[in-house]
């Protein structure tokens, strides 16, 4: 089963952040001059020939081969980031079922996911292996999901576990974009010298999905202001 948490389906507001105020310690952020930014998580290699002339594309490269990535570049995709989930396990990914004993709790509204203890060395090793595989495929960066595990489980071991994983990614020479993760990112930027994060993507800035009614809603002013201030 493919990943069903598809960003386009939920009509997320996607905000690519290259702000010096937020990421002042970064060198070069994701596609500093990117005008066409496309997120296609949930798609597979069947879309390869349908895409062209994109500055920054986010895909789940687990479903793409090295040749697919090369073909995307031939089609004019200038930067390619891969989705990677570091903070939860997903039942449709075969390797994640091996880590059930490290789960922390249910992931609200996503029954196929559970929060994972990112401080577990076994999980960190698994994530490193996934990172290596994505690097071999030729991606330019990582679109890192579920650092929000620190919001749900605000323990130093969880925070440090995220740092360990991001540090491994950073040493590959690829760029790192955090999806959401405001609680983690705010702490990181106030307590560390930023050498890891190149950008932030935030969902649900202006709208949100109401799971109970299966509909979309407009965020209230305070929510909009919180996210825009964060970004």
Predicted regions and their residues:
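Glycan-processing catalytic domains of CAZymes
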Residues: 29-231
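C-terminal motif of bacterial Sec signal peptides marking the signal peptidase cleavage site
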Residues: 24-25
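Bacterial N-terminal signal peptides that target proteins for export
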Residues: 3-13
């Amino acid at each position: 089963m493919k990943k069903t948490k598809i960003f386009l389906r939920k009509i997320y507001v996607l905000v690519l952040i290259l702000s010096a105020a937020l990421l002042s310690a970064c060198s070069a952020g994701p596609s500093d001059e990117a005008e066409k930014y496309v997120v296609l998580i949930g798609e597979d290699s069947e879309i390869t020939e349908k895409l062209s002339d994109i500055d920054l594309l986010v895909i789940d490269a687990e479903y793409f081969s090295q040749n697919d990535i090369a073909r995307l570049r031939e089609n004019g995709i200038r930067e390619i980031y891969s989705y990677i989930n570091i903070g939860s396990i997903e039942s449709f990914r075969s390797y994640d079922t091996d880590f059930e004993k490290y789960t922390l709790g249910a992931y609200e509204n996503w029954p196929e996911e559970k929060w994972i203890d990112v401080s577990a060395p076994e999980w960190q090793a698994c994530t490193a292996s996934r990172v290596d595989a994505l690097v071999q495929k030729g991606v330019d960066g990582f679109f890192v999901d579920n650092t929000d595990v620190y919001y749900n489980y605000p323990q130093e071991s969880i925070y440090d576990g995220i740092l360990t994983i991001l540090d491994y990614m950073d040493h590959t020479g690829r760029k790192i974009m955090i999806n959401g993760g405001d609680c983690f990112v705010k702490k990181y930027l106030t307590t560390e010298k930023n050498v890891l994060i190149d950008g932030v993507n935030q969902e649900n800035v202006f709208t949100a999905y109401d799971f109970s009614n299966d509909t979309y809603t407009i965020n209230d002013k305070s929510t909009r202001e919180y996210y825009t201030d964060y970004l």
